[in-house]
C-alpha cells in the first residue's frame, strides 16, 4: 500500500514475491464438458410450462408462452424447439400463416440441429396449406436432400409431396 505512505515511490519498490511466498505451480488443463451450453435460471421451467400448455391442447396459452420464451431467452439452445412448438400451437389455432413463420424461424435458427428436418417438413406442409404449392414442393424436396437419414420427416415429406401433386 505504497500509495498511502507519503515518502513511498512505486518505481523504487523491489519486485514483489508471489502470493503465499512460493513459486507458481502450473495447473493441469481443465477437462470435462466445458463446451456444453447452460440454460439461464428459469429457462427450462419456462420451456416446460409452454410445452405442457401445448400438450394439454391450450394452444393460445402455448403460443403466448413460447413467444415469451423466445423474447426472454434469445439464442437459447431450446429456441429451435420452442419455435417449432409455437408453430404447432399456431396450427392448432388455425393460423397457418403464422405457423409457417414459426417453422421458418425454427429452421433458420438452427438449420442443422436436431429439429431442423421436422421444422423444414412442417414449413413445406404449411406452405402447401396456404396454397403456395410450388414453394411447398421445393421445400418438401429439401427435407430428403438435406436430411436423408431423418426417416420420419423424409417419409412425411414424400407423403405430403404426393398429396400436393409435386413432380
Model-derived features with residue positions:
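Short solvent-exposed coil/turn linkers within tandem alpha-helical repeat scaffolds
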Residues: 70-78, 107-115, 144-156, 167
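Acidic, proline-/serine-/threonine-rich low-complexity intrinsically disordered segments
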Residues: 1-53
Amino acid at each position: 500500500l505504497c500509495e498511502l505512505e507519503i515518502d513511498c515511490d512505486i518505481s523504487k519498490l523491489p519486485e514483489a514475491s508471489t502470493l503465499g511466498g512460493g513459486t507458481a505451480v502450473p495447473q493441469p488443463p481443465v477437462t470435462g464438458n466445458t463446451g456444453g451450453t447452460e440454460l439461464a435460471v428459469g429457462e427450462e421451467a419456462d420451456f416446460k410450462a409452454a410445452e405442457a400448455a401445448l400438450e394439454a391442447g391450450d394452444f393460445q396459452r402455448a403460443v403466448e408462452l413460447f413467444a415469451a420464451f423466445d423474447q426472454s431467452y434469445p439464442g437459447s439452445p431450446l429456441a429451435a424447439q420452442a419455435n417449432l412448438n409455437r408453430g404447432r400451437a399456431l396450427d392448432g389455432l388455425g393460423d397457418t400463416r403464422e405457423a409457417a413463420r414459426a417453422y421458418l424461424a425454427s429452421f433458420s435458427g438452427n438449420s442443422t440441429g436436431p429439429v431442423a428436418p421436422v421444422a423444414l417438413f412442417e414449413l413445406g406442409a404449411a406452405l402447401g396449406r396456404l396454397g403456395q404449392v410450388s414453394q411447398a414442393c421445393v421445400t418438401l424436396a429439401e427435407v430428403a436432400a438435406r436430411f436423408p437419414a431423418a426417416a420420419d420427416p423424409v417419409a412425411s415429406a414424400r407423403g405430403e409431396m404426393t398429396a400436393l401433386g409435386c413432380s
